[in-house]
């Protein structure tokens, strides 16, 4: 920043203002594509590209704000942006799905119909959603999990028993635009959404924000204080992370947050896999 200031004071001031605007938008937790964000703020879609002064200052500011180390290489750079709601490109924004039918003006999307027939999981990117007008689940309920390993375990355990009733999504941590768009299509179609995530400060925060976004169409699944006790780990959670739990609005998550602040420990989906699996098996059997 000092180097840029030495070159041109006015441009340096504009640089700081633009990065500040990007950080302010990130706080709204609405994911955007990097080029779109850059063009909207500066008029140049490459303004925040890796290697530019603005791009470097943005990364430094994110790391300072999130108390993280600077990324080493392109892979860590992409991960950092994705975790803070900025997709480097339309393909990076994605959601993993099982048993989900996508609808277009021409009818059901043939590629995703093939995955459903084969009982295989697939990936939907933001690019794939161009031209998609709706989404159809196998039953009246859609189950959503936070972590990939949990998603894969459940699909592998249940795909042979499933006769087309089960629809399962994985948002992979902070939900990308692709995931939010698919969830919006499902709630618009009247489907009930059950969401389960890690019971650490970040996971509970994700669940609470999804609940606030989708209202009564989304229910919190297996994240109660009892589930927290069943899934508790030995991992200690620092005071800074625990402070994120002070503003939960969902009543179930608020009670779980109280328990977490008392114990100072995180609980994970992997520790309640049997409960999740049993819930899905009961759902399939009931259809």
Residues of each region from the PLM?
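Acidic beta-strand-to-loop metal/phosphate-binding motif
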Residues: 190-200
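Nucleic-acid enzyme cleavage-core boundary/entry regions
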Residues: 1-170, 175-188, 202, 208-212, ...
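Structural alpha-beta junctions
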Residues: 191, 213-219
């Amino acid at each position: 920043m000092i180097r840029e200031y030495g070159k041109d004071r006015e441009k340096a001031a504009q640089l700081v203002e633009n990065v500040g605007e990007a950080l302010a938008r990130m706080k709204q937790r609405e994911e955007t594509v990097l080029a779109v964000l850059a063009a909207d703020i500066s008029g140049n879609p490459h303004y925040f590209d890796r290697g530019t002064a603005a791009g470097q200052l943005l990364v430094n500011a994110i790391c300072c704000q999130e108390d993280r180390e600077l990324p080493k290489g392109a892979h860590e750079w992409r991960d950092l942006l994705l975790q803070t709601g900025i997709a480097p490109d339309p393909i990076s924004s994605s959601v993993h799905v099982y048993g989900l039918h996508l609808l277009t003006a021409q009818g059901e999307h043939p590629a995703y119909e093939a995955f459903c027939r084969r009982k295989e999981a697939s990936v939907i990117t933001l690019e794939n959603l161009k031209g998609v007008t709706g989404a159809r689940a196998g039953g009246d309920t859609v189950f959503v999990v936070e972590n990939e390993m949990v998603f894969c375990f459940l699909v592998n355990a249940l795909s042979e028993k499933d006769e087309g009733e089960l629809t399962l999504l994985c948002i992979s941590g902070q939900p990308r635009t692709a995931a939010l768009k698919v969830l919006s299509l499902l709630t618009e179609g009247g489907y009930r959404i059950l969401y389960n995530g890690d019971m650490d400060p970040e996971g509970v925060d994700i669940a609470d924000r999804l609940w606030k976004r989708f209202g009564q169409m989304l229910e919190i699944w297996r994240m109660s204080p009892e589930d927290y006790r069943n899934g508790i780990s030995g991992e200690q959670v620092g005071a800074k992370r625990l402070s994120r739990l002070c503003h939960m609005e969902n009543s179930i998550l608020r009670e779980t947050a109280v328990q977490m602040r008392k114990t100072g420990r995180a609980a994970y989906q992997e520790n309640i896999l049997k409960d999740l699996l049993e819930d899905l098996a009961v759902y399939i059997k009931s259809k």
